[in-house]
Amino acid sequence: ELLQEALRYGKPDVIAWYENPYLKKVRQLYAGQYSTAFDMNELPAKYLKQFPELKGIPIEYQDHHYTHAASGYYTSGYVNAAVVVIDSIGEWETLTIWQGSGGKLSRVYSQGYPHSFGLFYSAMTQRLGLKAQEDEYILMGMAAYGDADRKYNGITLKNAIMKELGIQTHSNKLHTFKKNLHRGCNWLLPELHTEQDMFDLAAATQEIYEVMLDRVIKLAKERVSFTENLVMMGGCALNCTANSMITSKYGFKDIWIMPNPGDAGSSIGVAQKYNSTSWNLNWQSPYLGHNIEGDYPVEKSLKALLDGEIIGIANGRAEFGPRALGNRTLTADPRGPLIKDKMNEIKRRQKFRPFAPMILEEDVHDYFEMPENVTQSPYMQFVAKCKHPKDFPAIVHIDGTSRVQTVNQLQHPDLYILLSRFKEETGCPMLVNTSLNIKGKPIVNDEHDAIEFSKHYNVKVFTSD
């Protein structure tokens, strides 16, 4: 279905890939991942053979970290910017800093395997009994329940982790690792196994990552000193808690994180390599996916919300990226004391996890202490202290923060109307927002998915008014 949609624009001249699989295999051999390295089934050329429509079209490979950097820089609208890419690993690189200037990108710093902040975070995700490369956001949420400075054998837990994993701090460069973490670290501190132990490990992991990120941002400013604009890309850019710590650090005043900063979003950077029309992609919206046509269900949604119901909204184009931003959303009144537990039950999630608020942009500062230099947060990329946490239990974490989505008339006029109408009726300018799916399942995409979700989980899903 996806291929047929793409072919509507004509047969492609080239198939471009977001990494070089052959360089990747060299690195896998170096790391001792022999079964993976010698598995040829994952090669793009092998995979694409199942599509006869693509026969004979040449395949070209792009540098993985370049595609991340390009996806961020060319959608930012900045002429000049420092671009930071942090992920688990590309072909070899795990962290890069780029200078964006006048439409050109140049690499000014590179750190390679096995020294990977992303692999560290994923390995610790696995250590907590979660799924690496998938559940890192759960670790981030768990951190608020833990104590990173808890004593362990006479030292703090975060120092114990750094010691055991061989994480070293250098005066003239970033952190490095003695341990290779691509296989995880289930062996780490085995005597820690209680629920509170897991929370404490999560807190220590998050704090270590924040210290690492702080040094990266400082280095980025040193290497690209002539700009106040910062672009962050790679899967680690989804760590909204850490993002909120660096919004005013080292002279950066404007931060852009493309709403899909992980590998899926790097497709934009790949395509831009072949775009000779303009280097500025003039980013307009993350609503780029499948379109459910019809009027946005303002009236139906408003009535159900005022009746205290938890509802789904599936209308318009699906969001490009991991965040639900109003078009594939499970929502409710955030003031109800039982809403969080009820929604977590529907979503099959851990009970400790809160939900995000979507709020009228003009009201955000009345309810949240936004990070410095962050005037709007349309893509849920930062956390903010809630000024009235007891009034909105569904959207406030244990540490008093919320992952805020601001909504204005330009970015989403229909959602803006719904929030405005809800405010008129209740005095509350916000609603709960979480993705319209069950944990581990795909998000609702089309009308059929919406019907099935409603049927299986007993939730009204409105696709139009």
Place the predicted regions along the sequence by residue.
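Residues that line or immediately flank small-molecule/substrate-binding pockets and catalytic motifs
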Residues: 19, 234, 259
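Structural motif
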Residues: 13-14, 16, 82, 229, 231-232, 312
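Short loop/turn segments at strand-loop or loop-helix junctions that form parts
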Residues: 15-27
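Phosphate/ATP-binding catalytic cores across multiple sugar-kinase/actin-like superfamilies
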Residues: 203-228
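Glycine-rich beta-strand-to-loop/alpha-helix junction loops that act as flexible
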Residues: 229-238
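Flexible beta->alpha loop and helix N-cap segments adjacent to enzyme active/binding sites
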Residues: 1-4, 8-10, 24-40, 45-61, ...
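Short acidic-aromatic active-site loops that bind/stabilize oxyanions
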Residues: 59-62, 191, 195-211, 408, ...
